[in-house]
Amino acid sequence: MVDIIFHYPFLGAMGDHSKKKPGTAMCVGCGSQIHDQFILRVSPDLEWHAACLKCAECSQYLDETCTCFVRDGKTYCKRDYVRLFGIKCAKCQVGFSSSDLVMRARDSVYHIECFRCSVCSRQLLPGDEFSLREHELLCRADHGLLLERAAAGSPRSPGPLPGARGLHLPDAGSGRQPALRPHVHKQTEKTTRVRTVLNEKQLHTLRTCYAANPRPDALMKEQLVEMTGLSPRVIRVWFQNKRCKDKKKSILMKQLQQQQHSDKTSLQGLTGTPLVAGSPIRHENAVQGSAVEVQTYQPPWKALSEFALQSDLDQPAFQQLVSFSESGSLGNSSGSDVTSLSSQLPDTPNSMVPSPVET
């Protein structure tokens, strides 16, 4: 709030305020003392010249026709303050208007069109589950895919072709580099890794059996050999890999459950916050800072002129006082002129005596 305070030290001889001395008002803008007829005071203790109260960005004068804001001792018009310090969309970095509907994810605010998964670009609707990872939105499917890749130890490795699943078989040896075998004609033999590709029918059969019994016996494995046409070794290795993968996933889920108290999930640098999208809400441009309202003010003698028209004041003496104030010659006149002029005025009610500047 900006208060308009009239600064007239020569009126100190009128009424009960004759014993008060005007304080020294210093302008915050230029740092000099204010000798104007009125000063602008920004609550609580910032005082300005009328010519110094302007926007620090565009130098627009701030008066009763606009709203201004104060931040770090600087004044801004509303347009520049919203542009510099207003809330912007976390996706497109564009500001909001008062009529925009927004989506919120913790401290981030998004346009409805910008509230999309950063991987598949699918728009997140109210009720959809998503996660917030490093200020990026992820839908539930893509977030689960990242967790599975991280659990498998290859976060960004390309997957197999659609419709076929790969199965890696371990080496027959101990995993060390093949050595020379002198007992076989002194020739080097290199072990090769066989890659077996399973079709959808074989994979469905193995998964159904695994769901019923993760550790099938020999009889069950023989039946699987007949049903799938795979070798016993391939079936044995598939069950081993499946159990190992499920064990890693179980350990991961336990780690996630232990961190639910902080609503965060983490895995090898992969951090995210599970959230549920709510309904769009109307954006309220709650900019930080103190709003400043510059009030309109009247000329210093307007109220006194209106009072004179409705009272029995001596008109010649009053007109002389008004013309004397407007000519600005009072500052160069002597103290005897002020005394003789004030003696011609009738007693003025205390309610009409302007108060000096409060410091």
Curated annotation (Swiss-Prot):
Region (LIM-binding domain (LID)): 272-301
The LIM zinc-binding domain, residue ranges: 25-86, 87-149
Segments of skewed composition (Low complexity): 326-336
GO CC annotation: chromatin; nucleus
InterPro entries assigned: HD, Homeobox_CS, Homeodomain-like_sf, ISL1/2-like, ISL1/2-like_LIM1, Znf_LIM
Polar residues: bias regions: 337-359
GO molecular function: cis-regulatory region sequence-specific DNA binding; DNA binding; DNA-binding transcription factor activity, RNA polymerase II-specific; metal ion binding; sequence-specific double-stranded DNA binding
Gene Ontology BP annotations: axonogenesis; negative regulation of neuron differentiation; neuron development; neuron fate specification; peripheral nervous system neuron development; positive regulation of transcription by RNA polymerase II; retinal ganglion cell axon guidance; spinal cord motor neuron cell fate specification
Alphabetized PANTHER family for the sequence: INSULIN GENE ENHANCER PROTEIN (PTHR24204), INSULIN GENE ENHANCER PROTEIN ISL-2 (PTHR24204:SF2)
Entry function: Transcriptional factor that defines subclasses of motoneurons that segregate into columns in the spinal cord and select distinct axon pathways.
Protein name, entry field: Insulin gene enhancer protein ISL-2
Species, as recorded: Homo sapiens (Human)
